[in-house]
């Protein structure tokens, strides 16, 4: 089953376990976020949204897009302006598509335990001794 959600002024077609990059969403890696603005679920089209439909997702990482250069030049005036912009993005993994006001499963509701320290740092410390 698929759904169409709206976030950050854009619409995304999503299905369970999809990994997508969206405009910045508040939350850290491992947090669960819910999207209530569901425009379509399967063959059900909302007017404007599907009542009682929620899409849950897990935040995988917070990041930034590639730099976009905005260059303006005024001809014959020796005048130019260069500015750069990097959009903040959030990578999310779609957990569930819920309809009819269903609650998220316990698996989606639980937060993941923090990861252990990287092994590379421990290996460097041992080789230095």
From Swiss-Prot:
One of its GO terms (biological process) is translation. Residues 100-129 are annotated as: Disordered. GO terms for molecular function: rRNA binding; structural constituent of ribosome. Coiled coil: none annotated. One of its GO terms (cellular component) is cytoplasm. SUPFAM superfamilies: L21p-like. Keywords: Ribonucleoprotein, Ribosomal protein, RNA-binding, rRNA-binding. NCBIfam families: L21 (TIGR00061). Belongs to the bacterial ribosomal protein bL21 family. This protein binds to 23S rRNA in the presence of protein L20. Part of the 50S ribosomal subunit. Contacts protein L20. This is Large ribosomal subunit protein bL21. It comes from Brucella anthropi (strain ATCC 49188 / DSM 6882 / CCUG 24695 / JCM 21032 / LMG 3331 / NBRC 15819 / NCTC 12168 / Alc 37). The gene is rplU.
